[in-house]
Amino acid sequence: MSNLKDIKRKIKSVQNTQKTTRAMKLVSTAKLRKAEEAARYSRVYALKINEVLSEIAYKINQYASVMTESKFFNTTKSVEKVDIIFVTADKGLCGGFNVQTIKTVRRMIDELKAKKIKVRLRAVGKKGIEFFNFQGVELLETYVGASSSPTYEKAQKIIKDAIDDFTNGITDKVVLIHNGYKNMISQEIRVNDIVPIEPSKIVAVETNSLMEFEPEDNYTKIMDELLNKYFEYSMYYALVDSLAAEHSARMQAMDNATNNAKQRVKQLNLAYNKARQESITTELIEIISGVESMK
């Protein structure tokens, strides 16, 4: 009888877990729609920035010195120190979402150190911070709350510190890593070399959307200011893209957990029915044996 009570208690426990995971799946599904929409709008804005950069590049293409004078295009300088900004979630229960990002960061650290390049880490998200703290790895900066509730202001703060160190010559390169949204059931790691920029990435294109103008400031300053906006939005896009991917991963993880709980309940019900049948059979045998002994 005690065995039956234990099984019944397990069934109740798994059923409660199933209710929780099902509720979390529904919450993640609802949040995913909002995050997906934010990521989509961010992509549109990012494409517009690229378009404007291309137009400006066409306008100033006659000034060959612009690219070489800008501090953001100095790709000939040897790389001795790299800043890695990486984004993870503030919460768990999202499958291998955070693990994939952390693995990518660790692999890049190993590759850079093998080349005698110093690495500094700027961690966005509680899970990444906890992991590297546990490993005893020094983190230059930590940001909690930006990945779970991304805003443009938070993105500005994160990227500004890294870009300032680059322009002041403290670092030679800035890399941004996050796990991005691919579709409802999959995510992909995205590694973006923020600075220095390869000049070939900005293709000069003539369009009719900009009026002819002669700016008061020099062209290098205009390009640098526009690129700063580009850096900020690259960081913001990484945050909203990561959030959409996080909800996608959590929705999938909770769906798998719900299905596993359902299967476990079936197995426990079978075990309960079998144990109950054995118990009834044992009782019947005892009754029959008792009757026989009284004859």
Swiss-Prot record:
Species this protein is from: Campylobacter concisus (strain 13826)
Described purpose of this protein according to its UniProt entry: Produces ATP from ADP in the presence of a proton gradient across the membrane. The gamma chain is believed to be important in regulating ATPase activity and the flow of protons through the CF(0) complex.
Record localization: Cell inner membrane
Keywords attached to this entry: ATP synthesis, Cell inner membrane, Cell membrane, CF(1), Hydrogen ion transport, Ion transport, Membrane, Transport
Lineage of the organism: Bacteria, Pseudomonadati, Campylobacterota, Epsilonproteobacteria, Campylobacterales
Subunit structure: F-type ATPases have 2 components, CF(1) - the catalytic core - and CF(0) - the membrane proton channel. CF(1) has five subunits: alpha(3), beta(3), gamma(1), delta(1), epsilon(1). CF(0) has three main subunits: a, b and c.
Gene field: atpG
Keyword Transcription recorded: no
Similarity field: Belongs to the ATPase gamma chain family.
GO biological process: proton motive force-driven plasma membrane ATP synthesis
Membrane association type: Peripheral membrane protein
PANTHER family listed in its UniProt record: ATP SYNTHASE GAMMA CHAIN, ATP SYNTHASE SUBUNIT GAMMA, MITOCHONDRIAL
GO cellular component: plasma membrane; proton-transporting ATP synthase complex
UniProt-recorded Gene Ontology molecular function terms: ATP binding; proton-transporting ATP synthase activity, rotational mechanism
Protein name: ATP synthase gamma chain
